[in-house]
Amino acid sequence: MSLLTEVETYVLSIVPSGPLKAEIAQRLEDVFAGKNTDLEALTEWLKTRPILSPLTKGILGFVFTLTVPSERGLQRRRFVQNALNGNGDPNNMDRAVKLYRKLKREITFHGAKEIALSYSAGALASCMGLIYNRMGAVTTEVAFGLVCATCEQIADSQHRSHRQMVATTNPLIRHENRMVLASTTAKAMEQMAGSSEQAAEAMEVASQARQMVQAMRAIGTHPSSSAGLKDDLLENLQTYQKRMGVQMQRFK
């Protein structure tokens, strides 16, 4: 796996699924391929994206700044600086300075990542802030190692939280989660269907599913009534894709 592929993998792991994730993935690919060299336009686009947490925006802004060649005098963006200040916690800043001193002696991506993984996400973000604000300089490889370690820490806590929700025995939470997944799947079907004539059927199925979820929420239904909703939708989606000559078996 190449260095940039690894960075893209880690960064995308902390971005919530949805159309925005696909947009961010495309921009990362363009930046890494040298196709997008307007750092100011990129960061302005990033600043106005909804849904993303300030920290995720900060990490993405840091990655864009590391990768896109920019003029010496280009201003640092306030929203990135604020996100990478470790919540203003002096303990985070102290640890960030110690980590920075270690990273300065490191020259490899994997070496930097190993060192960084023993620090908290707050300290890692503060260390990124030091580098972003030009208070410290490390090689690009080392900075990417720091980025990936931060994303791994964040993704680990997101995964723990997700696992707790999936494993919950509370029928109301499970019911709502199934309806949310069905609704999200329906939205994805509508986007994938596009405007072709054959898409009408897929659009109809997706639309009916969303109406059903809205009705179930409006009138209140038994927690078991949502069982299989998403799977039924995915089956419909795969049938539609086969007819269109697309083979995608990895949705489930």
UniProtKB/Swiss-Prot annotation:
Region of interest called Membrane-binding, as start-end residue ranges on this chain: 1-164
Cystine bridges: none
Top-level division of the source organism's lineage: Viruses
This protein's GO CC annotations: host cell nucleus; membrane; virion membrane
Cellular compartments annotated: Virion membrane; Host nucleus
Effect in UniProt of substituting A218T: In strain: Isolate A/Philippines/2/82/BS
Keyword field contains Membrane: yes
Region (RNP-binding): 165-252
Chief site of localization: virion
Resulting phenotype, T43M: In strain: Isolate A/Philippines/2/82/BS
Outcome when changing V15I: In strain: Isolate A/Philippines/2/82/BS
Subunit structure comment from the entry: Homodimer and homomultimer. Interacts with NEP. Binds ribonucleocapsid by both interacting with genomic RNA and NP protein. May interact with HA and NA. Cannot bind NP without genomic RNA.
Further comment found in the protein's record: Most abundant protein in virion. When expressed alone can form virus-like particles in transfected cells.
Family from the record: Belongs to the influenza viruses Matrix protein M1 family.
Cited function: Plays critical roles in virus replication, from virus entry and uncoating to assembly and budding of the virus particle. M1 binding to ribonucleocapsids (RNPs) in nucleus seems to inhibit viral transcription. Interaction of viral NEP with M1-RNP is thought to promote nuclear export of the complex, which is targeted to the virion assembly site at the apical plasma membrane in polarized epithelial cells. Interactions with NA and HA may bring M1, a non-raft-associated protein, into lipid rafts. Forms a continuous shell on the inner side of the lipid bilayer in virion, where it binds the RNP. Determines the virion's shape: spherical or filamentous. Clinical isolates of influenza are characterized by the presence of significant proportion of filamentous virions, whereas after multiple passage on eggs or cell culture, virions have only spherical morphology. Filamentous virions are thought to be important to infect neighboring cells, and spherical virions more suited to spread through aerosol between hosts organisms.
Annotated HAMAP family: INFV_M1 (MF_04068)
Protein name, per record: Matrix protein 1
